[in-house]
From Swiss-Prot:
The lineage of its organism: Bacteria, Bacillati, Mycoplasmatota, Mollicutes, Mycoplasmataceae. This is Elongation factor Ts. It is found in: Cytoplasm. GO terms for cellular component: cytoplasm. GO terms for molecular function: translation elongation factor activity. Keywords: Cytoplasm, Elongation factor, Protein biosynthesis. Coiled coil: none annotated. Belongs to the EF-Ts family. Residues 79-82 are annotated as: Involved in Mg(2+) ion dislocation from EF-Tu. The gene is tsf. Pfam families: EF_TS.
Length: 295
């Protein structure tokens, strides 16, 4: 099977594996990127990618708050150029304000919320699409009511990552902000290990076992010793995706969970948005685009 050079390049960027290894992985996986990543990991040829989803869609994410509520949202555009357009940025801010003043609990409800202009969010998006010349869409949002505990938002400077955290008790604003910044940087999938689904654990253990098959030293160990080693490897992998088990980026001498425990607070909600998570953008070169229009 022929392998597209673009796929090899993309797989190398994700996994840091060698070119020929990436080619073999794609051949063995029928050119499926996700399956190729698993193949490389099973054969010990790639690092465990923190982010295996292909992130390609453009736009921005934003977290914003008022006295009663917090909202985090993602609005997509077709190009990065438009995502930096002042009209686009103003529209996203207008949508955030409208959602903050609503009780919308679903995307369908959110689209019907009216903005200060008198238009619904859906109508505003249609108008912006016509004015800007690209499809503009509200992809997702979450609206959270403030409680007696602490809450914090973090928006990265590039407008591509935002986080929203809610704690059960009061926490110093600087400490809360540092934890929110940690979540943005380290991208944990779960608050703690108890939240990790069995499917995820089983998939990771399968990969670890496949990797172990090629390790002669491991295979020579007694079965009970090997089992404990594999369990240890799984625990290490799970700690990478569990916030409370990650080393705190502000001070790596302790874990995030230990830090929060020392402050007598628990994290009850964690939301992290990154532009385009899970969306695969179709990339078309100029020649192909022109050819398609001539058909």
């Amino acid at each position: 099977m022929a392998v597209d050079a673009k796929l090899i390049k993309e797989l190398r960027e994700i996994t840091q594996a060698g070119m020929m290894d990436c080619k073999k992985a794609l051949e063995a996986s029928d050119n499926n990127i996700d399956n190729a990543i698993v193949w490389l990991r099973e054969n010990g040829l790639a690092k465990a990618a923190k982010k295996t989803d292909r992130v390609a869609a453009e736009g921005i994410v934003l977290a914003k708050e008022n006295d009663q509520k917090i909202v985090i949202l993602e609005v997509n555009s077709e190009t990065d150029f438009v995502a930096k357009n002042e009209k686009f940025l103003s529209l996203v801010d207008e949508i955030a304000n409208a959602l903050l003043n609503s009780n919308a609990s679903s995307l369908e409800e959110g689209l019907q919320v009216k903005t200060d202009s008198g238009l619904t969010i859906e109508q505003s998006l249609i108008s912006a699409t016509a004015t800007i010349g690209e499809k503009i869409a509200l992809r997702r949002f979450e609206l959270v009511n403030k409680t007696s505990g602490s809450s914090v938002i973090y928006n990265h400077a590039n407008k591509r990552v935002s986080t929203l955290l809610v704690f059960d008790n009061k926490l110093d604003p600087t400490d809360a902000y540092n934890v929110a910044m940690h979540v943005a940087a380290m991208a944990p999938k779960y608050i703690n290990m108890d939240q990790i689904p069995e499917d995820f654990k089983n998939a990771e253990m399968h990969i670890i076992k496949e990797q172990a098959k090629d390790d002669a030293k491991l295979q020579a160990k007694p079965a009970n010793v090997l089992e404990n080693i594999l369990k240890g490897k799984l625990s290490k992998r799970l700690a990478e995706v569990s916030l409370l088990d990650q080393l705190f980026v502000i001070d790596e001498s302790f874990k995030v969970g230990d830090f929060l425990k020392s402050k007598h607070v628990s994290l009850v909600k964690m939301i992290r948005y990154e532009v385009g998570e899970g969306i695969e953008k179709v990339v078309t070169n100029f020649a192909d685009e022109v050819a398609a229009q001539l058909k």
